[in-house]
Regions:
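PRPP-associated nucleotide enzymes
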Residues: 1-222
Length: 222
């Protein structure tokens, strides 16, 4: 499967992540467990995806027993986190935990129109000022199904002026992930916890893990 994917798509091989993904798929997993599993998977996935970030020296510091050491850090001032409402909110804290300093969070509200399965943007709080444009935008959205929502988010961030986009997703469908990866291949890296082969006629991943937003926010059957 991996050999046929675009080079900017990465599938986690971490055994703990794969085990947690199996737990998340289960219909018996409740909302509290779902929230915890999404967070834990995002931690594991994000750690791999952000391993390329540049480490820089920031002077000297001292340990509690009086020894001097070189203080290393990452410049987070030009990194922004972009959760796709609403289910992307479940992955925000994990990425904030991984990074060594606070980063801005800009929300994108996108939903999929039921008949056409095309994305509709209803909220966008990316700053208008070019001085506030991030170099790296990290999109968090647990599911990439048709890929259209992910494509719309990548387009918005590219137009905003970011240099690079990293997409973190718990689970994707091969057709949707492939489409999203082709939208801006030179500027986008997509990291997924797992991949399923296809979609239902309603655009749901199969076997998938259901509507993750409904599972996170207890709105099943709305």
């Amino acid at each position: 499967m991996a050999s046929s994917l675009p080079p900017n798509v990465h599938i986690s091989k971490h055994p703990c992540l794969r085990a947690k993904l199996s737990q998340l798929r289960s219909k018996s997993t409740n909302a509290r467990e779902t929230k915890a599993l999404v967070h834990e998977i995002a931690l594991l996935l994000g750690t791999d995806a952000l391993s390329y970030l540049h480490l820089e020296e920031a002077g000297k510091d001292e340990t509690p027993i009086g020894y001097e050491y070189t203080f290393e850090t990452i410049d987070c001032s030009k990194i922004t986190l972009v959760p796709i409402l609403r289910s992307g909110l479940g992955m925000v804290e994990a990425v904030q935990t991984i990074l060594p300093a606070p980063v801005s969070v800009h929300h994108l509200g996108l939903f999929r129109e039921k008949l056409t399965l095309q994305p509709v943007e209803y909220y966008n709080n990316l700053p208008q000022s070019q001085a506030k444009v991030a170099k790296l935008a990290i999109i968090v959205d647990p599911i990439i199904a048709t890929g259209q929502t992910c494509i719309a988010a990548i387009q918005s961030l590219k137009e905003w002026g970011v240099e690079k986009v990293i997409v973190l997703s718990v689970l994707g469908a091969i057709p949707g992930v492939t489409s999203a990866a082709a939208e801006w291949p030179e500027g986008t890296e997509i990291w997924v916890g797992g991949l399923d082969e296809g979609l239902t006629d309603k655009g749901m991943i199969k076997p998938g893990l259901g509507d993750i937003g409904d599972r996170l926010f207890l709105t099943l059957g709305k």
